[in-house]
């Protein structure tokens, strides 16, 4: 659903020469100024619209960002320093990548909460959704999931860590093991799923295979 709060209403964006390139619209504004409107989507449905205005004091000077509606935690100034002085097109395109990837990560988290909220315990994420952690507690083990994205343009994690912690009340755990400090087991299949599938798809895969993985884990512990 479109968030109209980020749609520019200033008259400077009305009745101007525009160019549409994929999911962005470029406006020719007064003077040496350019307005860019970024349209974001998830699963084919429109999400937020953001805008950014670039200006140059003269045609000989480099452009700078004079206003924008991007989330404050996205590093627009760093992107400006890195790209805008040398390549305005690269700056515009890279900002589009950052915005769309942020929306993808955010909406993936929203979707697993919507679909599987009754199975998810604690859930934490950083503001740009580059760190996501949650627990699954509706099983014989407490499963902790931690995923990280090393770059703001990634929609699949660069790192994934999934650990199964035996619950002391689990039927298969012996009395001696209940008294001992629980030792977690890594769920490699779950880590692989998180790195190759979208978060909702990976979650479904993890839950589907979890009983078999836990059975193997308990069998391995009992045979040691």
Regions found by a protein language model. Name each.
Residues 5-224:
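Charged, low-complexity assembly regions of eukaryotic complex subunits
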